[in-house]
Amino acid sequence: MLKIIIPTIMLFPVTWCSSSPMIWINTTLHSLLISLAGLLFLNQFNDSNNNFSLTFFSDSLSSPLVVLTMWLLPLMIMASQHHLKKEPWTLKKLYISMLIFLQMFLIMTFTATELILFYILFEATLIPTLIIITRWGNQTERLNAGLYFLFYTLIGSLPLLVALIHIQNYLGSLNMLTMSFCFQELSNSWSSNLLWMACIMAFMVKMPLYGLHLWLPKAHVEAPIAGSMVLAAVLLKLGGYGMMRITMILNPMTKYMAYPFLMLCLWGMIMTSSICLRQTDLKSLIAYSSVSHMALVIVAILIQTPWSFMGATILMIAHGLTSSMLFCLANSNYERIHSRTMLLARGIQTILPLMATWWLLASLTNLALPPSINLIGELFVTMASFSWSNITIILMGLNMLITALYSLYMLTTTQRGKLTYHSHNLNPSFTRENTLMSMHMLPLLLFTLNPKIILGPTY
């Protein structure tokens, strides 16, 4: 793991020692080199002793998420250049440093062996994200969004800390690799129910579960582009990753306790998809679509079958790339039109035809068009939930239908129609933006050719 963490730490001197005009080039190239070196993680064997140490370990669940985190940093730096154009150089360097801190914490969170270390790093990711949202957001509402984000995450995570201390006293160890062997099965008592709730609640807030999702649209809408990208692509996946790890030691309680959460997810999935159909704000629409997709992942994890785990892992990776790309596209519209309202961007296809192609590709992957990995993930989850209960097929089908509707609604509203009078003299799409979109799209297309490398630990 140090071969990734040490080069990431070396990004700090690269950032602060670069001459002002060279910051963007140096940091982008260095972070891209790290992510290309990290691609080797995808081609690994679970039983190799190179992957395990007392502090860090990587297996087929954490590796794709680590690679996704590393792949995203150069993309975030590329996307932020226009947003920071008027900032002084010191603040630009500080902004990039926050992104590097975030990448470092995320990599260590996904590979932590001890659950307490995982918890500390899980909470540490909050600090750079909060600074990015509250310092570099566009409107004054960013402070309110930051407050929501902070308190939802902290209050949701506190019971987890208490539960982990209790398990530490009971077992004497919180090592993820050994816990599943030495942890006795929980009895069906009130104390076990509370322990299960405490362990799972932090991740439910992070995912977020429908009902605990109010911080997400606020944070997404007010965050700058890099904040939105990392929130949608990686921070939501922390919840899914944590749930997959912690449910291994909570059996057989998950079977009994999961029902209300499954109902809430299946209901919330339909509700948030329906909310998307009524949105006028582009970033808000993409944020609500994230809640809908993550509800599918929660359903998959709580069903606890190998197929559902595979579906959850694929969906997390696919959604990370797709939603990040959608936020980049929304940002490129915002840079030209200076509004997030979709109707004001209508007819933009006639001026920016290549950007319209990226919009089409992003919308199609979002609605899970065959043969995209989004579809493979949704099919796995649908089949797993159908074997759990036949009725879920109706809800899953309805969700797929509404997802297709709002994805096409988003595409037609922003791209088609009569051009508005203020849109005639827009900047053309830059090479930087097209490179950015292609680097989101390329992994999605390549994973389609070989999805087994992101099928997770149950494959």
Curated annotation (Swiss-Prot):
Which EC number applies? 7.1.1.2
Print the keywords alphabetically: Electron transport, Membrane, Mitochondrion, Mitochondrion inner membrane, NAD, Respiratory chain, Translocase, Transmembrane, Transmembrane helix, Transport, Ubiquinone
Q: Which GO terms describe its biological process?
A: electron transport coupled proton transport; mitochondrial electron transport, NADH to ubiquinone; mitochondrial respiratory chain complex I assembly
Leader sequence range is none
Asked if the Swiss-Prot or TrEMBL record annotates the protein with the keyword Transmembrane, the reply is yes
A GO cellular-component term linked to this record: mitochondrial inner membrane
| Superkingdom classification of source | Eukaryota
Look up the coiled coil feature and give its residue ranges. none
Instruction: Report which reactions are catalysed by this protein.
Output: a ubiquinone + NADH + 5 H(+)(in) = a ubiquinol + NAD(+) + 4 H(+)(out)
Q: Where are the transmembrane segments?
A: 22-42, 60-80, 90-110, 113-133, 145-165, 194-214, 224-244, 257-277, 284-303, 308-330, 351-371, 391-411
Q: Which GO terms describe its molecular function?
A: NADH dehydrogenase (ubiquinone) activity; ubiquinone binding
Topology term for the membrane: Multi-pass membrane protein
InterPro entries given in the database record = NADH4_N, NADH_Q_OxRdtase_chainM/4, NADH_UbQ_OxRdtase, ND/Mrp_TM
**Quaternary organization:** Core subunit of respiratory chain NADH dehydrogenase (Complex I) which is composed of 45 different subunits.
Outline what the protein does: Core subunit of the mitochondrial membrane respiratory chain NADH dehydrogenase (Complex I) which catalyzes electron transfer from NADH through the respiratory chain, using ubiquinone as an electron acceptor. Essential for the catalytic activity and assembly of complex I.
The record's family statement is: Belongs to the complex I subunit 4 family.
- The entry's protein name is NADH-ubiquinone oxidoreductase chain 4
What is the native source organism of this protein?
A: Lemur catta (Ring-tailed lemur)
